């Protein structure tokens, strides 16, 4: 619960301490035991948005499966294989994924020079063009037909010119897991 996968878990430190305390005396063998443990830490007044253990289970799943690491390696691999005018469209199902996607896409959407530079060299121009304005959310009609779509965020970019040569080693490093997406994990 101290990993970045748990960064949006309410009261994650008290929950982690309580898990350690309980495990010192007995193993946590069932999901029901973990739910009870989380319920004992989080006051009833803070449970308006549903079961608080839901985010704990999500954080554990994300960390155990290495989901953010896989995402951070997959996005640059895709970018390196895009042809000019190729599109990268990503659906994110929770805020941590969306943040990683947003930060990755922003690398190619921004001018890569100091703010006071009078002339911007060609290789510092953005190589992605945004196809969505921020993250698109499901419409109310879609949510009525598919309740799971309420958490989905969609972002899309198009490769508007070849990736500059100086970016390729950086993307290759990210794809190999040698360097995380800036601000990602």
Where are these regions (language model features)?
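Single conserved hydrophobic/aromatic residue that forms the stacking wall/gate
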Residues: 1-6, 10
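Short, well-ordered alpha-helical segments in soluble proteins
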Residues: 7, 23-26, 38, 42
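P-loop NTPase catalytic cores that bind/hydrolyze ATP
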Residues: 14-16
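Short, charged, surface-exposed loops that flank catalytic or proteolytic processing sites
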Residues: 26-34
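C-terminal catalytic and target-recognition region of SAM-dependent MTase-like enzymes
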Residues: 30-31, 39-80, 87-185
């Amino acid at each position: 619960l101290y990993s970045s996968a748990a960064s949006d878990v309410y009261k994650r430190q008290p929950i982690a301490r309580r898990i350690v305390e309980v495990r010192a005396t007995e193993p946590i063998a069932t999901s029901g035991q973990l739910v009870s443990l989380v319920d004992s830490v989080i006051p009833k007044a803070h449970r308006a948005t549903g079961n608080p253990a839901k985010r704990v289970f999500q954080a554990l799943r994300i960390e155990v499966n290495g989901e953010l690491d896989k995402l951070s390696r997959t996005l640059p691999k895709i970018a390196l294989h895009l042809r000019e005018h190729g599109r990268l469209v990503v659906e994110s199902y929770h805020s941590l994924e969306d943040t990683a996607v947003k930060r990755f896409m922003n690398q190619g959407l921004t001018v890569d020079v100091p703010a006071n530079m009078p002339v911007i060299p060609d290789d510092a121009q953005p190589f992605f063009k945004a196809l969505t304005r921020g993250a698109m959310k499901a419409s109310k009609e879609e949510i009525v037909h598919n309740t799971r779509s309420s958490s989905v965020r969609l972002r899309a970019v198009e490769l508007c010119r070849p990736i500059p040569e100086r970016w390729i080693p950086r993307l290759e490093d990210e794809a190999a897991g040698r360097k995380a997406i800036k601000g990602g994990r």
